């Protein structure tokens, strides 16, 4: 349900979705408020929405973010040796080009990094992470659809 939710994956490989409203036109949207998404143990797929707090837990987790985020998600335990970040951008317009993705130190919060996608901060990463651009993959929405990566957007919640 939409609202402030806490989703816990527990042991095993889980899919956690922090989006409400699913697909909007050709791409994912998020009308939900902040959620807490904790993958627990296992290799999890966590799709973050706006203002969500993401804790992957142990295992090799894949964190998915994108242009649907209007308030930065907070990632509190990203481990670049194990985890991966995947950013989806909307290429439905013929003139669309991949947005610039930039990682920089947060000037207001020591020890935190900001991840910018175009002119929007989509993630705040805290902790001892040494996140850099090599840890981020960028994929178009059409490619994500072809790979069925956007299928989980149709049913918010834990799976």
Question: What feature does the model see in each segment?
Answer:
Residues 68-70, 79-94, 129:
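Acidic glycine-/aspartate-rich tracts in secreted/extracellular proteins
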Residues 104-159:
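Low-complexity acidic/polar repeat-biased segments
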Residues 19, 49, 65-66, 78, ...:
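Feature marks extracellular polysaccharide-active and adherence modules
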Residues 54, 71, 92-94, 121-123:
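Short, surface-exposed beta-strand-loop junctions and turns on beta-sheet-rich folds
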Residues 13, 20, 91-105:
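GD-rich hexapeptide-repeat beta-solenoids
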């Amino acid at each position: 349900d939409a609202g402030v939710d806490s989703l816990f994956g527990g042991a095993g490989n889980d899919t956690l979705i922090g989006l409400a409203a699913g697909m909007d036109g050709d791409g994912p949207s998020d009308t939900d408020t902040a959620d807490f998404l904790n993958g627990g143990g296992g290799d999890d797929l966590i799709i973050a929405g706006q203002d969500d707090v993401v804790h992957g837990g142990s295992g090799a987790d894949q964190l998915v973010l994108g242009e649907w985020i209007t308030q930065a998600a907070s990632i509190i335990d990203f481990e670049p040796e194990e985890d991966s970040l995947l950013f989806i951008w909307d290429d439905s317009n013929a003139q669309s080009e991949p947005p610039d993705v930039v990682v920089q130190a947060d000037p207001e919060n020591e020890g935190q990094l900001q991840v910018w996608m175009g002119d929007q901060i989509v993630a705040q990463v805290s902790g001892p992470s040494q996140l850099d651009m090599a840890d981020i993959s960028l994929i178009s929405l059409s490619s994500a659809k072809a790979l069925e990566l956007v299928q989980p957007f149709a049913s918010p919640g834990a799976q």
